[in-house]
Curated annotation (Swiss-Prot):
Keyword Metal-binding: yes
Conditions for induction: Transcription is repressed by glucose and by the binding of AraR to the operon promoter. L-arabinose acts as an inducer by inhibiting the binding of AraR to the DNA, thus allowing expression of the gene.
Protein name, UniProt field: Sugar-phosphatase AraL
Catalyzed reactions: sugar phosphate + H2O = sugar + phosphate; O-phospho-L-serine + H2O = L-serine + phosphate; O-phospho-D-serine + H2O = D-serine + phosphate
Length: 272
């Protein structure tokens, strides 16, 4: 059921950016009605890009998860902070060497982009920080050595937490804080939503401009902020980090119980 609309004027975005964690999935669980909502949008002729700040997975891993949930997609219709980070480094720092505080998905995207790995932390030009769910002291200490040795810091995102089956789990902000504090260094660039890098990558994947798009997500700080900053329509879902009634820095165009209510917006002629 639709909870709130900031206006009743019908909207007709050509492209839809759909956040994954907290919107389509909660951990590994598919949120009820998500698959059907995506099918509805496709029947309406909408272009769809799946978007996530999760920097510990690759697009291939993400596609496998979506296919396993019965959601067809192409790897080129997936935009992750890991893939956008890799593309940024390839474009602007193609001869630089990186050290990674992160998991295999990020390593895979950097390799696909042709980004060079440093052989040891102190040789790194950049330290790339991302979510690391099996983090060890040795991992953290090697990242510290890279930053203390002068490596510039780029983070896939700076989310404080992300939704999973058990509630919320610590995200990249915890890893960034540990390195910045211990190495007395500052992160130079955060790639993930709501950055223009993510918005541009998503719009480019669809061949559309930002004002032709709508974003659906569970986070005020990343999803709705990105929509508002770059002229997209936005729909907030309450199946993830945002809760009904909380104060919001950015006001979404729509607030929905769940992504499944996208179907209701279409039936009511609000989304056309």
């Amino acid at each position: 059921m639709r909870i709130m609309a900031s206006h009743d004027t019908p909207v007709s975005p050509a492209g839809i950016l759909i956040d994954l964690d907290g919107t389509v999935f909660r951990g590994n669980e598919l949120i009820e009605g998500a698959r059907e909502a995506i099918k509805t949008l496709r029947r309406m002729g909408k272009k769809i890009v799946f978007l996530s700040n999760r920097g510990n997975i690759s697009r291939a891993m993400c596609r496998k998860k979506l296919l396993g949930a019965g959601i067809e997609t192409d790897v080129n219709d997936i935009v992750l902070s890991s893939s956008v980070t890799a593309a940024f480094l390839k474009k602007h720092y193609r001869f630089s060497k990186v050290w990674v505080l992160g998991e295999q998905g990020l390593v895979d995207e950097l390799r696909l982009a042709g980004v060079q790995n440093a052989s040891e932390p102190k040789e790194a030009d950049w330290l790339v920080i991302s979510l690391h769910e099996t983090l060890t002291y040795d991992d953290l200490n090697q990242a510290f050595q890279a930053a203390a040795g002068g490596a510039r810091i780029i983070a896939t995102n700076k989310d404080r937490s992300f939704p999973n089956e058990d509630g919320n789990a610590i995200d990249v902000a915890g890893m960034i804080g540990a390195i910045e504090t211990s190495a007395q260094a500052k992160t130079e660039l955060v790639v993930g939503k709501p950055s223009w890098l993510m918005a541009e990558a998503a719009c480019t994947a669809m061949g559309l401009s930002a004002h032709e798009c709508m974003i659906i997500g569970d986070s005020i700080e990343s999803d709705i902020a990105m929509g508002k900053l770059y002229g997209m329509k936005s729909a907030l879902v309450l199946t993830g980090s945002a809760k009904q009634g909380e104060q919001r820095l950015y006001t979404p165009d729509y607030v929905l119980d769940s992504i499944k209510d996208v179907t209701k917006l279409a039936e009511e002629g609000i989304l056309i």
